[in-house]
Amino acid sequence: MTYSDMVTIKFIFDIASPNGYLCHKVIPNYEKKYSVKFNYEICLLGGIHKLSNNQPPMIANAEIPNKFNYFDVEIKRFVELHKLTKFCLNPHFPINTLTMQRGALVAQEEGFLIEYIDCIAAGMWEDKKDMGDTEILINHLNKSGLSGEKILERTSEPEVKQKLIKNTEDAVSAGAFGVPTFFLHNQIFWGKEALREMPDYF
């Protein structure tokens, strides 16, 4: 099978979401198992929520304790199933990921997106760092062999800023209301549980 023959899945992604992190971690094996390709669409989760009139689960479910607690159970179940032993909740959550997401667009343009996401994902959801702090973010990128200063310098470029806005608006226009969202054959799938459902539609 050539690359052009592969089924491609658009992945609406922001590292702000722990479920986005969990999906990112299992995607490499998923791609090998099903011979599919995920294309990351870098968006801003806060913007998606605002444009779709949605709220983060921790706010939307704050007055529904059973539902709020279920999300914790369901994450633990996914973590155990996929042996994602490094995952941990970040005590600084919620974290402003605007700079990181702009950096992801820079990395995507320059050809090292997955390496970049691996790096910021570890900082956010394994090392418990306050990745919204510019100095911490730069140091973390540098320690991973990426040029934090150069990446962040480009995040102020108007084209990068506008690209993130457009990606976010386009995602909501297509039907997205949160992360992780997937688009397969023009059908929308939401949540990490969609990874089990999508093979029926390949």
Q: Where are the regions a protein language model picked out?
A:
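Structural alpha/beta surface segment adjacent to cysteine/selenocysteine redox centers
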Residues: 22-124
